[in-house]
């Protein structure tokens, strides 16, 4: 009987994915060869591929092969891992090797002529050891031990520099900081293990690591020319555009990838985040339904559905349901945790939002977004010290991100550091202009309004008006922008213009107490500036307000109480990795006001029309 021919047939059926046929012949070969270890190993492989995990593990462990051969130990542990028996899998990998293992192997070679499995089973020892480290990392991940998981992935990569799965798990899950990524790349023995492909590996690794770098034309080494159109390389470039807030260019690149490969795994999270940032709800709806139909067990499918419900608004309960399903399928899926936090943040549920963001921060140590959102929530709960600390951490990871710069400026404003706030806002504006030469995305409207607020504090009234008018171009029907312009006009003594702007603001939002109060004061001051006799021309200008002169004179006494409280508007904008729709919340803050006579002699001692904070979710 020619067993070698039957063994080749087993491998042939495995290559053709005819696993049942392969299993049948592997079982017969194992019996004919008197259960030689390599035949039992291939029998276990066939059982594993037919999802008979416990049978496969029993075939190896009942014969003690997992204690004698690294390949058998790895396969037995992988069977337990596939059956979600994580602790048993770890026990198999970490079991102590018998002292007489090498003597026994030598005996097998001498007595039975059995060859070294490294050559007979077509696997090198370094490759098997790397696979064991990789599997150990996955098990630690499943057991929520991220530190040991990270260490195991690093070891797997050092043992086998071609083990891209370990590298991808480290980078795509943001398990390393930028400095740690750099140190890892330098520590890899590329010249020792892959002399010929060293340039190729270095290019591919560096290209995937530079997500926070400024996007530039991809420079392909001559030795690997032809990778310009490779989809993984294009996705890495798109990711850099995404993290530098150039969402339109990112969308162009991801659309090209999705056209060539509609379900490209590494492109999907970036593409979904871009659709949210650009508010393409219909496209996201179509994509999410297609993903759920085709890949119901993939967390990115439910992440897409959750993002859609967050984007359309008033569907936060639905969004949480689907995002929770994504985190159940893969509890280390960071983008879903960020979006889950957004679903609470939109309802001003700060504690639940921060809990989700903290979970994301633990999972995504190398990503700045969880830190940004935690800081934002602390800012909204008036804890500026903690907010500043988290913004600083986000800034250390992504120093070029205009969203982070903007939030640091907001904290400086709240601390009364007007010059510092202006610097951060202007830096953020420069970064945005560098992306597209001019500010056109409506998500930057809060930044322009905040520049107007800080310029008003610095008594740069002309510049403040200019910034508020630019904000009106982006979002024309924003009542708070009109009231801010009216306020500046009142400070400049242009009471007629101020009255017009406050009236427009009230037309857009009738319950704006700040505009109601300021309108009354400006009308009174406008009358005071006019002649004692109110002529027909003045009456014509004021008749639209339905106030008689007596009402105007007594307006201060009627509406002064609202000075005690004023409504602040906070605009948050979400997305990650990950982008979700603009969120608006309001809160009231006590404030003491000077007398009417002092109102326009000095800039009001208000805590000011609250700076709008922008929030963007990068989903990857």
Swiss-Prot record:
Location of Phosphothreonine modifications: 581, 599
Basic and acidic residues biased stretches: 585-596
UniProt xrefs under Pfam families: ANAPC3, TPR_12
Keywords: Cell cycle, Cell division, Cytoplasm, Cytoskeleton, Mitosis, Phosphoprotein, Repeat, TPR repeat, Ubl conjugation pathway
Modified how: Phosphorylated. Phosphorylation on Ser-560 occurs specifically during mitosis.
Protein name: Cell division cycle protein 16 homolog
Phosphoserine: residues carrying this PTM: 112, 490, 560, 595
Compartments (UniProt record): Cytoplasm, Cytoskeleton, Microtubule organizing center, Centrosome; Cytoplasm, Cytoskeleton, Spindle
Annotated region described as Disordered, given as residue ranges: 574-599
Family membership: Belongs to the APC6/CDC16 family.
């Amino acid at each position: 009987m020619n067993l070698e021919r039957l063994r080749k047939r087993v491998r042939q059926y495995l290559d053709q994915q005819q696993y049942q046929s392969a299993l049948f012949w592997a079982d017969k070969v194992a019996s004919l060869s008197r259960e030689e270890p390599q035949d039992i190993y291939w029998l276990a492989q066939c059982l594993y591929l037919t999802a008979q995990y416990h049978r496969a593990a029993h075939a190896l462990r009942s014969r003690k092969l997992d204690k004698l051969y690294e390949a058998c130990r790895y396969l037995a542990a992988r069977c337990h891992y596939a059956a979600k028996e994580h602790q048993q899998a770890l026990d198999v990998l970490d079991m102590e090797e018998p002292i007489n293992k090498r003597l026994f192997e030598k005996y097998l070679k001498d007595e039975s002529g059995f060859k070294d499995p490294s050559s007979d089973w077509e696997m090198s020892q370094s490759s098997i050891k790397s696979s064991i480290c990789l599997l150990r990392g996955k098990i630690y991940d499943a057991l929520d031990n991220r530190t040991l998981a990270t260490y195991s992935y690093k070891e797997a990569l050092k043992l086998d520099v071609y083990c891209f799965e370990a590298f991808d798990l480290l980078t795509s899950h943001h398990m390393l900081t930028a400095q740690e990524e750099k140190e890892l790349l330098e520590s890899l023995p590329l010249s020792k293990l892959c002399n010929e492909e060293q340039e190729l590996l270095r290019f591919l690794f560096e290209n995937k690591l530079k997500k926070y770098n400024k996007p530039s034309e991809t420079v392909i080494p001559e030795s690997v020319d032809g990778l310009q159109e490779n989809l993984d390389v294009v996705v890495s470039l798109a990711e850099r555009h995404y993290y530098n807030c150039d969402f339109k260019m990112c969308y162009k690149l991801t659309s090209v990838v999705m056209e060539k490969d509609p379900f490209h795994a590494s492109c999907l999270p970036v593409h979904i985040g871009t659709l949210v940032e650009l508010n393409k709800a219909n496209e996201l709806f179509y994509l999410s339904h297609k993903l759920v139909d085709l890949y119901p067990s993939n967390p990115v499918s439910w992440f897409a559905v959750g993002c859609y419900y967050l984007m359309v608004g008033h569907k936060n309960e639905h969004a949480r349901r689907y995002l929770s399903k994504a985190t159940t399928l893969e509890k280390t899926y960071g983008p879903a945790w960020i979006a889950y936090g957004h679903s609470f943040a939109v309802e001003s549920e700060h504690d639940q939002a921060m809990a989700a963001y903290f979970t994301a921060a633990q999972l995504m140590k190398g990503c700045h977004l969880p830190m940004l959102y935690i800081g934002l929530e602390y800012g909204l709960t008036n804890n500026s010290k903690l907010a500043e600390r988290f913004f600083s951490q986000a800034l250390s990871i992504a120093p070029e991100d205009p969203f982070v710069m903007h939030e640091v400026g907001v904290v400086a404003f709240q601390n009364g550091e007007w010059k510092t706030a202006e610097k951060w806002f202007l830096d953020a504006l420069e970064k945005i202009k560098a992306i597209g030469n001019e500010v056109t995305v409506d998500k930057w409207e809060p930044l322009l309004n905040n520049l107007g607020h800080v310029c008003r504090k610095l008594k740069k009234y002309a510049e403040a008006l200019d910034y508020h008018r630019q904000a009106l171009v982006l979002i024309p029907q924003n009542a708070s922008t009109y009231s801010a312009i009216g306020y500046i006009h009142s400070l400049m003594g242009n009471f007629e213009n101020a009255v017009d702007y406050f009236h427009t603001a009230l037309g857009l939002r009738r319950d704006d107490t700040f505009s109601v109060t300021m309108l009354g004061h400006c009308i009174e001051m406008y009358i005071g500036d006019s002649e004692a006799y109110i002529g027909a021309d003045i009456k014509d200008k004021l008749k639209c307000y339905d106030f008689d002169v007596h009402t105007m004179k007594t307006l201060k006494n009627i509406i002064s109480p609202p000075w005690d409280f004023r409504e602040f508007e906070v605009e948050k904008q979400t997305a990650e990795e990950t982008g979700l729709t603009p969120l608006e919340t309001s809160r009231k803050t006590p404030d003491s006001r000077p007398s009417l006579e002092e109102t326009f002699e000095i800039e009001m001692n208000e805590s000011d029309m609250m700076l709008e904070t922008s929030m963007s979710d990068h989903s990857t």
